Design a protein with these regions (language model features):
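Ferredoxin-reductase
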Residues: 1-78, 135-137, 164-166
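Short, Lys/Arg- and Gly-enriched loop/turn segments at beta-strand edges
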Residues: 38-45, 87-95
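Helix-loop module immediately N-terminal to the HCX5R catalytic loop
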Residues: 76-91, 181
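Histidine-anchored nucleotide/phosphate-binding helix
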Residues: 112-122
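Reductase modules of NAD(P)H-dependent flavoproteins
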Residues: 128, 132-235
């Protein structure tokens, strides 16, 4: 468990018995259950079949029962339980078609997108892959250097970090609206083949999904993962 920024941690889960591990795809989600039974869903950021562990990106949520436990009480090596995996937000291309892929997310919405991008590149996807990750301020972003390096190794992969304010002189970050940037990146010549993955807060996901659909992307080509915040019960 290590920090990705001031409010997000990377949690690595290794099963006690790999023979009983469920199948999963990068971008799907699982249910994480702590020793007292508190359960939350988190997206998978890596390929378990290759790495032998699961990687989750978890934001510290105000009044969040599970995140309070993770950030303040959990110790390395402590046992947790998982159920899953579920969801259709993952890379699929059984026919090896060179369709373009657009990945758009905010906050820990990067987790499934990071997994999907790596999965597509491992499968030698031939179409362009564009990933837009947004935050309100630069401190909300993470994995910028890793994604820039990935882009330098794969000419067909393009990455852009965006913030609403505070970009300053950091050349890794663009100040602007992530929805507008994503919409403007869509090529009318390939819109019929485009696959879009949107992850983040529900209002962001639902709003951008509608805009992308109205722009002409097929509904069946849009995959979404909306992250719902759950607060602790009040006494």
């Amino acid at each position: 468990m290590d920090k990705l920024n001031n409010s997000i941690i990377r949690l690595i889960l290794t099963p006690e018995n790999s023979d009983t591990m469920f199948e999963s795809r990068p971008g799907q989600y699982l249910n994480l259950i702590n020793p007292t039974g508190v359960t939350r869903s988190y997206s998978i950021a890596n390929d378990y079949s290759l790495d032998g562990h699961l990687e989750l990106h978890i934001a510290n949520m105000p009044q969040g029962e599970l995140t309070h436990w993770l950030f303040n009480e959990a110790k390395p090596g402590e046992q947790v339980y998982i159920r899953g995996a579920a969801g259709d937000c993952f890379y699929v291309n059984s026919d090896h078609q060179p369709f373009p892929i657009l990945l758009v997310g905010t906050g820990t919405g990067l987790a499934p997108l990071y997994g999907i991008a790596h999965d597509a590149l491992r499968h030698r996807h031939e179409g362009n892959i564009s990933l837009f990750h947004g935050g309100s301020i630069p401190e909300r972003l993470y994995y910028m250097d890793e994604l820039r390096q990935l882009a330098s190794l794969h000419p067909g992969f393009h990455y852009q970090a965006l913030v609403l304010t505070g970009a300053g002189t950091d050349d890794r970050i663009q100040q602007g609206d992530i929805e507008l940037a994503a919409l403007n990146s869509i090529d009318p010549l390939t819109i019929g083949q485009l696959r879009v993955y949107i992850c983040g807060a529900p209002e962001f996901v639902q709003g951008l999904r509608k805009k992308i659909f109205l722009k002409g992307v097929r509904s069946s080509h849009i995959f979404c993962d909306a992250f719902v915040t759950r607060k602790a019960a009040q006494s």
